[in-house]
Regions:
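Acidic-aromatic substrate-binding/catalytic surfaces of carbohydrate-active enzymes
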Residues: 25, 93, 97, 380-467, ...
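Buried hydrophobic-core signal for structured, non-transmembrane domains
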Residues: 314, 381, 386, 508-511, ...
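Loop-rich catalytic cores of soluble enzymes, especially ATP-dependent carboxylate-amine ligases
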Residues: 138-196, 413, 531-582, 587, ...
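Catalytic alpha-helical scaffold of carbohydrate-active enzymes acting on polysaccharides/glycoconjugates
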Residues: 1-115, 122-169, 185-202, 221-236, ...
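Beta-strand-rich recognition/accessory modules
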Residues: 363-370, 453-456, 463-493, 502-506, ...
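Acidic (Asp/Glu-rich), glycine- and aromatic
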Residues: 391, 396-402, 411, 486-490, ...
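An acidic- and aromatic-residue-enriched active-site/binding cleft used to recognize and process polar
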Residues: 11-13, 51-53, 82-85, 111, ...
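Active-site and substrate-binding clefts of carbohydrate-active enzymes
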Residues: 2-29, 39-41, 156-158, 163-167, ...
Length: 640
């Protein structure tokens, strides 16, 4: 009986942000264990999937020994890219550059150019076939879950085709360190019984994933050694091969069309509607649109000296581990989300350094790429993104001096239907509401006070203005609110502005009563802050000599104030607030949502004012917030 052919693919992954020193130690151990394993079991053949930046942090002596393994055809390296790009969410040009740069690094450091591609999370796009073939890659490896149920266990490899272009594609059985079988041979035999491969053509591709994080995973190499020992004992029955050798020694089993899909867990099912889920998550669409926008700006850059370094940073930002939610990584984690925004803010600041107008800059653009317009105000220190279609709310507020998007608070409440900014669900800035005049902050925090208006669901008319003193946008809406089933007309005008070359953001509200009857109401506007220190004692609220530590866990309020401040010692920033007229300021605990919510995902602050308007009268309040830098602890996050 012919021996069964087994292609064993290992993929050490880095899904969490790690300090460079920790990553280097983990990489050194990876290559040392791999070299020792291959020397101890000379009949073993392995394929190893890696992002190219891992090689840049490897010890030179270890790389030299790995090159010796290449020479004796014991191991092959398979490419994920320079990083692990999210194919479905990234600009195609950026993904191509990522993969090409990865090939270049592999060639420079190992002397070998990979011929295989390993899409992270089996994130597959049919349109990538043409690109992979053009840059010299001849095969790809994806989870067998992407294949039709009647053939996914058939073994071998197939030919995937799209628009006349084709590539060899291996269906793999994915196992994680935590789910690796205790009896390797018995596990393989059970797979064989469930499969449909012909007796003389039995290629099984096993994809073993383990983490490079020494704090999260324990003992992945022990199981690797166990696997190698078991295969070595049964060499008469099982023949280990590299994937590149399997293509040369066997024929494709036929053609298969693999649609756009993704597998998010080792034993999960292929999800062909994963982008609908992704755009249902708060902040996901904003991150993606900012990535696309920054890439477009970089593409137009004429200063070629700065482009390669900035593009390399974008490779890390488009990494799927930052852009897809997971238990240990992804934009749902405060650290990952703020890291991604921070890196993109740094790139934008570098690009704007030589072209920012003296008084500031105004852009009116289709930022969401949905046919609408977004107003963007910016200067050297701040950049503000305003969605006039949904109540004139601010969905991003970049403090460039500290590389912080202060409006990137997150809620686990999903957007339904999927949308980039969801009215009433997204945790943005300046969400305006009208409440009954006797409403208290504590009652509102408990959810017992309904809103009488829908300002954040409707568009405002707008006009922009630039002068030597700064830039501003004026938004106006004739609307109404409801009291006892009666529509009460109201005119709302709000102005946002940036002062020239300063970290001062100003806001003005004017409410006009066009009716012939007096009105009495409580007007509120909500701001959701994202600080690195949210949920910890490093975040404090100041009012005069009073200090409130660790806000966000329970309700508290400041009454009749015109000045207060928020300190974030971890982020190194203090925000001073000032209003012309006294206001009440409410700080709310996490909203009760269907899933777990935590104070570290954002701080909700509401500015509330009771207003009495006579017929044809108006009310106006002017405010500003000033961002100032504090001493900041050192940043040791990640390799980018």
């Amino acid at each position: 009986m012919k021996r069964q052919t087994i292609a064993f693919l290992i993929q050490p992954f880095k899904n969490r942000l790690l300090p460079p020193s920790v990553l280097r130690d983990s990489i050194d151990r990876l290559f040392k264990e791999l070299i020792d394993l291959m020397n101890e079991f000379p009949h073993l053949r392995l394929s190893c999937g890696l992002p190219a930046y891992i090689l840049e942090h490897a010890n030179a002596l270890n790389l030299s020994k790995v090159r010796d393994l290449f020479k004796r055809d014991a191991i092959e390296l398979i490419l994920t890219g320079y990083t692990e790009p999210f194919l479905s969410l990234s600009p195609t040009v950026l993904t191509r550059e990522n993969i090409q740069h990865g090939l270049k690094v592999f060639n420079e450091l190992t002397g070998v150019i990979p011929t295989g591609y390993l899409p992270p999370f089996s994130n597959w796009e049919p349109s990538i076939i043409e690109m992979l073939r053009e840059i010299g890659l001849t095969y790809a490896v994806v989870s067998q879950e992407l294949f039709p149920s009647n053939i996914k266990n058939s073994g071998g490899y197939w030919t995937a085709e799209h628009a006349g272009k084709s590539i060899s594609i291996f269906p793999s059985i994915s196992i994680h360190q935590t789910s690796a079988p205790a009896d390797m041979i018995d596990w393989i035999e059970k797979i064989n019984k469930s499969g449909s491969a012909a007796e003389n053509d039995r290629l099984l591709t096993i994809h073993y994933l383990f983490s490079l994080d020494p704090l999260r995973e324990a003992g992945p190499y022990r199981w690797l050694r166990f696997m190698a020992s078991e295969l070595d004992k049964h060499l008469l029955n099982y023949q280990p091969v590299r994937l590149c050798d399997a293509i040369n020694s066997s024929q494709s089993r036929g053609f298969q069309y693999i649609p756009s899909s993704m597998v998010t867990e080792a034993h999960g099912q292929a999800d062909r509607h994963f982008l609908n889920y992704l755009y249902s998550c708060d902040q996901a669409g904003i991150l993606q649109r900012k990535l696309v926008d920054v890439h477009d700006q970089l593409t137009l850059q004429t200063n070629q000296k700065t482009v390669p370094a900035l593009r390399k940073q974008l490779f890390f930002i488009q990494d799927i581990n930052r852009l897809f939610p997971g238990r240990e990584s992804g934009f749902t984690l405060v650290s990952d989300r703020m890291w991604s925004f921070g890196k993109m803010i740094d790139i934008e600041s570098s690009l704007d350094a030589h072209q920012a107008p003296e008084g500031g800059k105004i852009q009116v653009t289709d930022y969401f790429r949905d046919g609408g317009k977004t107003v963007i105000l910016s200067n050297k220190h701040l950049k503000v993104y305003i969605d006039h279609k949904k109540g004139g709310q601010i969905f991003s507020f970049d403090h460039r001096d500290r590389s912080l998007n202060l409006a990137s608070a997150y809620t686990p409440d999903l957007h339904d239907p999927p949308d980039i900014v969801s009215s009433g669900r997204s945790r943005t800035w300046f969400l305006d509401r009208i409440l009954p005049s006797n409403a208290s902050g504590n009652e509102y925090a408990q959810g017992t006070i309904p809103s009488l208006s829908n300002f954040y669901q409707s568009p405002f008319d707008y006009k922009v203005s630039a002068a030597s003193g700064g830039v501003k946008v004026i938004m106006i809406r004739n609307c109404s609110y409801i009291i006892e089933d009666r529509n009460i007309p109201l005119r709302v005008e709000k102005v946002f502005g940036l002062e020239k070359n300063s970290s001062i953001f100003s806001f003005v509200y004017q409410l006009t009563n066009p009716s012939l009857v007096p009105v009495n109401l409580k007007f509120t506007t909500e701001l959701n802050f994202s600080f690195p220190s949210c949920g910890s004692t490093d975040l404090r609220v100041f009012h005069g000599s009073t200090v409130h530590e660790n806000p966000g866990w329970q309700f508290f309020q400041l009454k009749d104030v015109t000045r207060w401040a928020i300190d974030d010692r971890c982020g190194g920033i203090r925000i001073h607030f000032q209003t012309q007229k006294p206001v009440d300021v409410w700080f709310l605990p996490p909203a009760p949502v269907t899933r777990h919510s935590s104070p570290n995902q954002g701080l909700t602050m509401i500015i509330a004012t009771e207003i009495n308007l006579s017929p044809s009268a108006n009310w106006k309040n002017i405010g500003k917030l000033t961002c100032r830098k504090l001493k900041k602890p050192g940043n040791h996050h990640d390799v980018c």
